[in-house]
């Protein structure tokens, strides 16, 4: 039962729910939409980094190497790796007095 369709009223014995007819198609649709929204929100929180990276960069994994000779591919890989190696060794040390 959806929380949106329940009405709690204080009576002598405590709190009870007086719910409208649950076979109403609008109530069923609202319940399904609410459950789907909750599931999607949980998945978004769990996989936020993966999803945002996928949307930002798309499905591309790098430049296409189709039709490029293997020797040129290897040369390109070495250039990319050397560029990464240079970046990894470049740090700035700051000393506070």
UniProtKB/Swiss-Prot annotation:
Residues found modified as Phosphoserine: 64, 82
GO cellular component: host cell plasma membrane; membrane; virion membrane
Alphabetical UniProt keywords: Disulfide bond, Host cell membrane, Host membrane, Host-virus interaction, Hydrogen ion transport, Inhibition of host autophagy by virus, Ion channel, Ion transport, Lipoprotein, Membrane, Palmitate, Phosphoprotein, Signal-anchor, Transmembrane, Transmembrane helix, Transport, Viral ion channel, Virion
Signal peptide location: none
Biological role stated in the UniProt entry: Forms a proton-selective ion channel that is necessary for the efficient release of the viral genome during virus entry. After attaching to the cell surface, the virion enters the cell by endocytosis. Acidification of the endosome triggers M2 ion channel activity.
HAMAP family for this protein: INFV_M2 (MF_04069)
Protein's name according to its UniProt entry: Matrix protein 2
Organism in which the protein naturally occurs: Influenza A virus (strain A/Duck/England/1/1956 H11N6)
């Amino acid at each position: 039962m959806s929380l949106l369709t329940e009405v709690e009223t204080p009576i002598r014995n405590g709190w009870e729910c007086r719910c409208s007819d649950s076979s109403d198609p609008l109530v069923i649709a609202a319940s399904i939409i609410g459950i789907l929204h909750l599931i999607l929100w949980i998945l978004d929180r769990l996989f936020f980094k993966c999803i945002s990276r996928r949307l930002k960069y798309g499905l591309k994994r790098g430049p296409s190497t189709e039709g490029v000779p293997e020797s040129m591919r290897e040369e390109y890989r070495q250039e990319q790796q050397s560029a990464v190696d240079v970046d990894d060794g470049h740090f700035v040390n700051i000393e506070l007095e």
